[in-house]
Amino acid sequence: MDCHKEKLNEFQKKYVHSPMSKRECEACHLRHGKIAVLSLREREERRLCYTCHSQMGLNMDKMANVHTALKQGMCVPCHNPHASENKSLLKKTGSEQCFTCHKQATFMRAKRHKPLADGCLTCHSAHGSPYKDNLRKQEVELCQSCHNFTANNFRKAHKDYPVQKGKCTGCHTPHSSTNDKLLRESVHAPLNLGQCASCHKPVTDPNALGVIALDGKLCYTCHKK
């Protein structure tokens, strides 16, 4: 630290990385240099971190989906390697850390999913997951953590929609939308042409949607098999 006095302020922060708090700089750096100007002991950053965080390394090597930065071998896009005011040595707090890479505008439209306000980690794993998009559970199972699919209001709202055959994100965006119920932005061609009757019968039909045919049969009248 005699030369790197600019790092002394790091010791005043709330959370200090264990090797640094013990002044064990050589746990990560080589005294005389080896790789680039950082003189790191490992060429790939995450492998260096795994020398101490070994269980994390074992877990990530088995994961089907790994956070992009970590997959590219980097930990410092999210974590400060020396010290931070934030838990887990994060550079920013909560979702603000995620918005460093993920464009915030996509998440800030008028209608917002409640878990978004609670934080991205409500639905996503920070490092990796067996599931697509680093979700904590399979998509439908994850949605059921908050939404009771057997409740009367849910069943009524989805009556005659083939929800059992698809995923929630087929119709809803998981983050934010300009539409009520977080419905996706999509204008079906017949609707765009004002041809509602090409799919729907008069409103007196007992079927809630009043569609000409159920399930995929209706779609195949235009979209050939």
Where are these regions (language model features)?
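Short sequence/structural segments immediately N-terminal
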Residues: 1-225
